[in-house]
Amino acid sequence: MMTTSVLRMIRSGGGWQLLDDGRPVFWFPERNKGLEIARLMADARSLNHGTRTMLEVQNDDDAMETIAAFA
């Protein structure tokens, strides 16, 4: 069975918090910069370790939305 990792961007403190499997790892003042780093992390994790990684972002309705998957 393949392990799946989840990176999540949530609103926090006037910016965006990046969570790695529920653990806070970075805070960004801008959503786009956070997404840029999160995509890079997810892609690297998939390429280097073969770990399936999902990237989820909190939308305007406060629901989590999957915006990318790296396998």
Residue ranges of each PLM-predicted region?
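Short, mixed-charge low-complexity intrinsically disordered segments
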Residues: 47-71
